[in-house]
Amino acid sequence: MDAVTVNNFFLIGAVLVGMSILVSSLSSRLGIPILVIFLAVGMIAGNDGVGGIVFDNYPVAYLVGNLALAVILLDGGLRTRVSSFRVALWPALSLATLGVLVTTGLTGIAAAWLFDLHWMEGLLIGAIVGSTDAAAVFSLLGGKGLNERVTATLEIESGSNDPMAVFLTVTLIEMLASGQTGLSWGFVLHLVQQFGLGALLGLGGGWLLLQLINRMHLAGGLYPLLVISGGLLVFALANAVGGSGILAIYLCGLLLGNRPIRSRHGILHMLDGMAWLAQIGMFLVLGLLVTPHDLWPIALPALALALWMILVARPLSVLIGLIPFRAFHDREKAFIAWVGLRGAVPIILAVFPLMAGLPNAQLFFNVAFFIVLVSLLVQGTSLPWAARLLRVVVPPDPAPISRAGLEIHPTSEWELFVYHLNKEKWCIGAALRELKMPGGTRIAALFRGTELLHPSGSTILEADDILCVIGHEHDLPALGKLFSQAPDRGLGARFFGDFVLEGDAQLSAVASLYGLKLDGIDGEQALGRFIAHEIGGEAVIGDQVEWNGLTWTVAALEGNRIRKVGVKFPEGRPGPGLFL
């Protein structure tokens, strides 16, 4: 490779990445998932597009795809709160194993019939497209304001279902290549090995990396690089010993993100940029890899297969996978079924048969690419609409306009929160001494216009003041009520109900106040405890229960305890207008 070729490579790469970033603004305007934009740029630059770039190097595409997935999952793990596991771990694992098996089987049967293939080849197509994609899920769910149970289930599922899909794909390829026509029980041991070694190396490697980071004194910019290199080492080691590298690097990030770690905010900021670059690079390469005119001959059967998977296979797999978990409302199950997003993973898995030289390998790749395109366009585009229709959106916690870490000590986790005081907030016109600040927080600075003030207890707050507060992440809910204006998501003021009651209120007192019948229910228990029992599992904000003709909504939590409950009356039925 001479200097001119290298320079042309840099030129083309920079132009494609720059174009992807610039046209990404069309995503919000057109309501199209941003991943489709990146994919489209690659296709336009490819063999059939205006760019005319011929790219058919499948090993390079496999390398780029795996590297990008590793970075995206590391970033996703760092941002996942381990508290979400209390409501979603077992449901997500059920979907990641049993759900993938059901989806693979149903999709495989349809694929074999639609494309006139052997049943094992049909199952291979089902396995290739059987898992949801972490890159697509993390990208499209971010900032949508979904309730915790739905978000956590989808994110944990997407981060943990790839081992099953990879295992099924590799096993079926080996069987087809060797001429086997039946399944053996040895695949169960292989599956346990994938999950077990992936989890062990992910958590073990994450712990070792955490100890190393907190004991090393490095330049600030080196900590993110150490996290990335350590995560990739865990990913590669897990793959090398027969475990799931994808699961390992996700769990490595999860452990790092939920423990005190040096330079946390520097790591998160850099990983955010790296994850975006990984998504752009991965979907550009996959867009270049496909030849659009090869998709037209299979368009009708591939579209039928995609719709079968979206409308039949995925809903049935979710319905079966969530049978043991009664805390899930039918609305939540329907939304989880709809958001079975396919992305880069199926396309990368579709490269496996090509590298193995299987007959019909190009057909498998084209079908997988078509299904991913339909999934992103249909499911990804309709995601906000489906969330509102199925009422899985909850009012977001008010947040500061910006926040920055204060690297005092790895275990202190102090942060600086910046608030813009909206004119509608009650604190406008109040003196600072009148504010009920959370314990352990301090006002560090007050800006009025471009002027830095020296605040005292008698300083009066005015509209459009900028307030800087030092505190911890757990102080955000209380600070938000004082200073923030929650973003408008089209949710009415009555989302939680006509009145909000304390979760500690005695149930008999609530029943007496609203004229409700207990019908043998223990009236001595707290309202919050009763609602939790009716939900049937770990509660999340936004959970609803119908009781005595009224709608009871979980409005606030304190740990696992329901702290506040909203009550909503049917239209035309007045309430007593009291708070307990």
Swiss-Prot record:
Protein's recorded name: K(+)/H(+) antiporter NhaP2
Pfam families, sorted: CorC_HlyC, Na_H_Exchanger, TrkA_C
Record's catalysed reaction(s): K(+)(in) + H(+)(out) = K(+)(out) + H(+)(in)
Protein localization: Cell inner membrane
Residue intervals passing through the bilayer: 3-23, 34-54, 58-78, 95-115, 122-142, 163-183, 185-205, 218-238, 241-261, 270-290, 303-323, 335-355, 363-383
UniProt record similarity statement: Belongs to the monovalent cation:proton antiporter 1 (CPA1) transporter (TC 2.A.36) family. NhaP2 subfamily.
Organism of origin: Pseudomonas aeruginosa (strain UCBPP-PA14)
GO biological process: cell volume homeostasis
PROSITE patterns on file: RCK_C
Function: K(+)/H(+) antiporter that extrudes potassium in exchange for external protons and maintains the internal concentration of potassium under toxic levels.
Main location: membrane
Domain of life, source organism: Bacteria
Residue stretches making up the RCK C-terminal domain: 403-485
